[in-house]
């Protein structure tokens, strides 16, 4: 059996009743990964040996009947540290980096008995929105292999959508969980900033980065967030966990809930079929008893410009350490210290990473700091205030996750600005540190359309409640790409 059509709770029951063992489930998952890998390129490293050792230990200790994730396989994005498993951030710069520790999110998952089966492909150093900037080649969309899977958590999304794994971890700096979740028709959540520790995450934009879960359904997504969320002394920005169980409101009705629909999220640049899908979703929420009203987020149009100044500035600082001396790939053709620095970084980083380092260095440079970085910080505050005004009167915000469905591979690589605009609707959530989820809401041109729900800080359980209500009464999550297959 492949088990890829079984939910986490169904797998848990099979494990507890000993109809299958953790080792058998892990072996089946590894076969699922290998059989689809040539078509998708969603993994950088398949950790077969380590996964089977973990599974054997769990079988010997016995499945924890009270812990639904005990013995469940997990794929981890390649910028999240895993003890003894290559963690390259999909870059030549870190081609041979093998951490000697687990990121806190991974350690938390392992404590719950989860088994790390591999590291997923991604845009290099999480910089990119298409899954194409990886040193190890582009990941393909699970629904159409000629389309991008979204990014930067491309492999994590494609792996879940295709049935390679049931659960995976990604990171989200400007939409890197939600956009690939939308393009692949699965559920992806970017938690409130600080909910999941960043310790062990290879830094891109430290004021924006957040680790989060991918899953085929809302409840399974919440179960994984339960496992990884924690306050952590190793991350000074981590927050106390305010919600004991993120699934606590799933199944409750949403009558009387007020949902805002920003007019800016359905304006210029939004594909007409995507817009129609979201408007239909808004009507569906009204049928479920929610009140949906149009609002304005006037400064959201500046989000992309603000983000690319702030994120690139933070990246230029964070990536200084990769110089061939302290960390990272060292060029062999260097004859002096200056050449080691220049050649190692020139050869070790890809084009998109170098583009963002240069933009960030420029934004922070003397004479330009006030005009760019400082100004971006001021506009970021205005974006935050826009959200606060809306959340004073509304429970959640509704909109599309991305302006379009997945586009052709290699179609935007020569137009960075056009690719950056694909994150237009997800970026403001990171700038404000808010939680946001993408769930399947329909199809356009045979490709999934993602619906985004945004809440005030620490409102994940409400987001899950509303997302689950939509999921339960629509069924879009039940539609699967051809590559998914079914139980044998």
From Swiss-Prot:
It catalyses: L-glutamyl-tRNA(Gln) + L-glutamine + ATP + H2O = L-glutaminyl-tRNA(Gln) + L-glutamate + ADP + phosphate + H(+). The keyword Ligase applies. The active site is at 77 (charge relay system), 152 (charge relay system), 176 (acyl-ester intermediate). Coiled coil: none annotated. The keyword Ligase applies. Allows the formation of correctly charged Gln-tRNA(Gln) through the transamidation of misacylated Glu-tRNA(Gln) in organisms which lack glutaminyl-tRNA synthetase. The reaction takes place in the presence of glutamine and ATP through an activated gamma-phospho-Glu-tRNA(Gln). This is Glutamyl-tRNA(Gln) amidotransferase subunit A. It comes from Streptococcus pneumoniae serotype 2 (strain D39 / NCTC 7466).
